[in-house]
């Protein structure tokens, strides 16, 4: 009888999910010329690049931000996806590029790395520099 009570008390803890978020270093996108960064060209380039890399992207005109999501792992008990976002800079400053990894499911955070580096974002920064649109710098 006591064992069944303990089991019933632990059952919700077993089936409750865990959400863990890890982020890469934030980057500012600085134009290569003295002219301000063309957001339309930036979002168009970002949409093409990340869509080709397997992300689902959307931009929001009212908040002027851009967001892409890619599923990295989708198994019955655990899902992982990467999110890439471009936000407008403070007070009209340079846009901010942020990437995070979301882990959701039954695997506790003790077994998931808190370190995350998105190789797609590094490749996108190289792409922007080669296209002479912008350069990525680590945000302070």
Q: What are these regions, as identified by a protein language model?
A:
Residues 7-8, 93:
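A broad, structure-centric signal for solvent-exposed, well-ordered loop/edge residues
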Residues 14-17:
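C-terminal motif of bacterial Sec signal peptides marking the signal peptidase cleavage site
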Residues 19-140:
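Ser/Thr-rich, low-complexity intrinsically disordered terminal regions
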Residues 1-7:
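Bacterial N-terminal signal peptides that target proteins for export
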């Amino acid at each position: 009888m006591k064992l069944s009570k303990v089991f019933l008390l632990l059952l919700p803890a077993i089936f409750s999910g865990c959400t863990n978020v890890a982020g890469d270093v934030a980057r500012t996108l600085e134009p290569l010329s003295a002219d301000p960064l063309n957001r339309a060209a930036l979002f168009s380039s970002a949409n093409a690049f990340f869509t080709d890399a397997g992300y689902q992207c959307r931009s929001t005109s009212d908040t002027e931000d851009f967001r892409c999501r890619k599923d990295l792992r989708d198994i019955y008990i655990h899902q992982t996806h990467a999110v890439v976002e471009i936000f407008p800079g403070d007070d009209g400053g340079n846009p901010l590029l942020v990437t995070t990894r979301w882990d959701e499911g039954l695997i506790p955070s003790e077994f998931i790395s808190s370190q995350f580096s998105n190789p797609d974002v590094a490749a996108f920064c190289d792409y922007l520099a080669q296209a002479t649109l912008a350069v990525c710098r680590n945000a302070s």
